[in-house]
Amino acid sequence: MTKKILVWALVIAFLAATMGCAEWNRTQKGAAIGAGAGAAAGGLIGAASGNTAAGLLIGAAVGGVAGAFIGRYMDKQAEEIERDIAGARVERIGEGIKITFDSGILFDVNQADLKYDSQTELAQLSTILNKYADTNIMLAGHTDSTGSAEYNMGLSQRRARTVADYLVAQNVDPIRLDVQGFGEDEPIASNDTAAGRALNRRVEVAIWANDKLKKVAAEKAG
């Protein structure tokens, strides 16, 4: 019970940081979140919210002036992704970026081979990732609850791996990539409706500062 109270207290604090000051820009919010959350809070918030990518981004924040520097770097990258990739839903979380591709954009039903048309969008994403090279990237596959949990886990892993392989083929450094499959374990909508299941079938891309960028940010902060 005490742990649950702590988790939700952290969630409320996070929401206050992101929503309580409407006049803040994304960079300022990122600095505040990083200063107030930290890795432990990020992990707990991710667990409570049921979204590993969001928790990872919150936990990776450094906060303060350095966090604001990283936030500006991410703002520019997020703007380019939103502008150039029509099929991507882009969120700025802390000092990172979460991109969501509905699986229907990338894959046919129950398949892990990329649709031909989706390769254009992933090529554009690769160009931006290569331009902003001082980041780590997690690729997270997700499914709905149709079929067995074991099958869904395997499908989500194969799809995340397929996206990773395509990015590497477009010269994204594989050392930057972490590939994960979560199967049906992290739904973002109800699996009781067709619309909800469609939202749950997705690939998420989490982007956050690597050690090099954090070092530069710390030096800029003095």
Q: Residue spans of the language-model regions?
A:
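Periplasmic peptidoglycan-binding/anchoring modules of Gram-negative envelope and division proteins
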Residues: R83-D84, F107-G141, D165-V168, A198-N200, ...
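Acidic/histidine-rich, surface-exposed loop or edge segments in extracytoplasmic proteins
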Residues: A60-G64, F101-D108
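Extracytoplasmic/secreted proteins, especially bacterial periplasmic and envelope-associated proteins
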Residues: A31-A35, A39, L56, K76, ...
